[in-house]
Design a protein with these regions (language model features):
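Intrinsically disordered, low-complexity regulatory regions
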Residues: 1-46, 66-70
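Short, compact, well-ordered microdomains
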Residues: 46-69
């Protein structure tokens, strides 16, 4: 890990118009998956964890877009 990587990860990256479209697609896909989990899985700690991990996945995917894969 380099200082440049750390600096990149902790720097605000203003989204481009293309990024905004990508973020929306990621959120919509994740929302659909989370709804499927909600509909198909019984109420449980595992269901809650599964939906939380979908949310975490979206945040991590958004970070990859913002940081341009760096």
């Amino acid at each position: 890990m380099t200082i440049e990587q750390i600096d990149n990860w902790f720097t605000y990256h203003a989204p481009s118009s293309d990024d905004l479209v990508t973020y929306e697609k990621l959120r919509n896909s994740a929302r659909d998956f989370a709804k499927a989990i909600n509909d198909l899985c019984p109420e449980s700690a595992d269901k809650t964890a599964a939906i939380r991990k979908v949310r975490e996945a979206v945040m991590t995917a958004n970070a990859s877009v913002a940081c341009k894969g760096k």
